[in-house]
Design a protein with these regions (language model features):
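Catalytic alpha/beta core domains of metabolic enzymes, predominantly
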Residues: 109-243
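Short, acidic/polar
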Residues: 2-15, 64-74, 117, 193-200
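C-terminal functional modules
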Residues: 240-287
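Active-site mouth loops of central-metabolism enzymes
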Residues: 1-7, 55-66, 180-192
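N-terminal active-site wall of soluble small-molecule enzyme domains
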Residues: 35-81, 92-94
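Short, well-ordered coil/turn segments that N-cap beta-strands
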Residues: 17-19, 47-53, 79-81, 102-104, ...
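Glycine-rich, proline-tolerant flexible connector loops at the mouths of alpha/beta enzymes
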Residues: 19-42
Length: 287
C-alpha cells in the first residue's frame, strides 16, 4: 500500500463511522529508526480521523525495537493505542505491561486458551486488558464455530472486550502477507457477504469490536457494515412463492425474541401466540 491509499481509505471509513484500525509490526524488516518514523506518521494521520490503532507484536518485535515489558516508550513515541501480543512475553512481563505508565492497552490473543484470569489475580490491570482473535489467510485454516465459541466464552466470562475479523470479498485484497483468500477469524465466514459475517459474530453475543482483516474493502462493503443493526440479531428473508400477507404481518409486526428451548436448527418466537388472527394460514404440502 501507499500513504496516499491508506489516507483515502481512512477518510472513507471514518465517514461511515468506523473507529478502530489494526496494523502489524510482525513482518516489518526496517531499522528501528525507520519503523518509528513511518508508524508515527501513520498514527498521526489515523488519530486525525478519530481512529484508535492497535499494532500486532510478539517478543521478536519488542527485541527489534528495543522495548521491554517495563519500558515501552518506543510504542508511546509512535502513538500506539493498543499493543496486541500475538505471542505473549511471559506471565510476569505481561502483568508489568498492563501497568505501563502510558495508558497503552494490552490486547491478548483470543485464539488461544490463556489463563488471563490468573494474571488478573496476580496483579494484572484488568481495565487495561482486552483480547482479539487471529485472522487466517488460507482456506480451511480459520477457526471452526466450535473453537471460536469455546475461546470467546472463555474470555467473555472475564469481562474483557473482544475483537474479531471479517473479510472483504473484493478481488486482490491483501493483509500483512501477499495472500488473496481473505482474512476472517471464522472459516465459515470466508465466503459470506461482509454484512452477514458481522451479523454472525454479533449473533454470538460474544464480540464487541469487528474489524476487516484485509484491504481495501469497497465503499459498498463499508456501507453494508455500517448499516448492520448491532442491537439485535437480524436476518435477511427469502419468501416462499406462496407466502401470505398474514405470514408477512407475523414476521414484521413484532419484535421477536427466541425461546430458551429453541433447537440447533432454527430460532423460535412465541410472541405471535399472544395475538388473535381472524385469518388462518393455509396448510402447505410437504416436499
Amino acid at each position: 500500500s501507499t500513504p496516499e491509499a491508506d489516507d483515502a481509505y481512512m477518510a472513507l471509513a471514518s465517514n461511515y463511522g468506523f473507529s478502530r484500525i489494526f496494523t502489524c509490526l510482525l513482518s516489518v524488516d526496517k531499522s528501528p529508526e525507520e519503523t518509528v518514523a513511518e508508524f508515527s506518521q501513520f498514527m498521526d494521520r489515523a488519530h486525525g480521523y478519530g481512529f484508535t490503532v492497535a499494532v500486532d507484536t510478539n517478543p521478536r518485535v519488542f527485541q527489534h525495537l528495543g522495548a521491554t515489558a517495563t519500558d515501552i516508550s518506543v510504542f508511546a513515541k509512535m502513538g500506539v493505542d493498543i499493543i496486541r501480543l500475538d505471542g505473549h512475553l511471559g506471565d510476569r512481563q505481561d502483568i508489568a505491561l498492563t501497568r505501563n505508565p502510558y495508558g497503552i492497552a494490552v490486547e491478548f490473543n483470543a485464539s488461544q486458551m490463556l489463563s488471563l484470569d490468573l494474571l488478573i489475580e496476580r496483579g494484572a490491570y484488568r481495565r487495561n486488558m482486552c483480547v482479539c482473535h487471529n485472522f487466517y489467510p488460507q482456506r480451511f485454516s480459520g477457526l471452526s464455530e466450535k473453537r471460536f465459541i469455546e475461546f470467546s466464552e472463555h474470555y467473555f466470562g472475564m469481562g474483557l472486550t473482544q475483537a474479531a475479523f471479517v473479510t472483504s470479498q473484493q478481488n486482490n485484497t491483501f493483509g500483512p502477507w501477499p495472500v488473496y483468500d481473505g482474512l476472517p477469524t471464522c472459516e465459515d465466514d470466508r465466503t459470506r457477504s461482509i454484512d452477514l459475517q458481522a451479523r454472525h459474530l454479533l449473533a454470538t453475543g460474544l464480540i464487541d469490536d469487528i474489524m476487516i482483516g484485509n484491504c481495501f474493502a469497497s465503499e459498498e462493503e463499508l456501507a453494508a457494515l455500517a448499516a448492520v443493526d448491532t442491537t439485535k440479531v437480524t436476518f435477511k428473508v427469502e419468501f416462499d412463492s406462496g407466502v401470505t400477507e398474514v405470514e408477512k404481518n407475523v414476521l414484521y409486526q413484532f419484535n421477536h425474541v427466541t425461546r430458551g428451548d429453541a433447537s440447533e436448527y432454527y430460532l423460535r418466537s412465541s410472541v405471535p401466540r399472544m395475538f388473535e388472527y381472524s385469518t388462518s394460514i393455509p396448510a402447505r404440502e410437504r416436499t
